[in-house]
Swiss-Prot record:
The gene is H3v2. Belongs to the histone H3 family. It comes from the Eukaryota. One of its GO terms (cellular component) is nucleus. GO terms for molecular function: DNA binding; protein heterodimerization activity. This is Histone H3.v2. InterPro entries: Histone-fold, Histone_H2A/H2B/H3. Pfam families: Histone.
């Protein structure tokens, strides 16, 4: 059980590290700046809220299609219609 939790934690950290790297690359050389713990925590919180909204929308789409499982079609459709409606966030 512990190895499963450690594996999930390391995957989460890899995703967060990739997001942080992309944000720093967008503005400047990432090696010249560092992020504080509070900034990383805020970034993680914002990312989790964003993903929660996407998954909730996809669950509604799956329920509309009389399914209980979110498929890649739901996520692709969400990305397609995202520019056409005002975001809730």
């Amino acid at each position: 059980m512990t190895s499963v939790n450690n594996n999930m934690t390391s995957r989460r950290n890899l995703v967060l590290r990739e997001i942080k790297r992309q944000i720093l690359w967008a503005w400047t050389d990432p090696k010249s700046y560092r992020m504080s713990v509070g900034a990383i925590h805020a970034l993680r919180t914002a990312f989790e809220c964003y993903m929660n909204i996407i998954m909730t929308d996809c669950a509604i789409m799956a329920a509309h299609g009389k399914r209980k499982t979110i498929t890649d079609r739901d996520i692709a459709f969400h990305q397609y219609i995202k520019p056409f409606y005002l975001p809730r966030y």
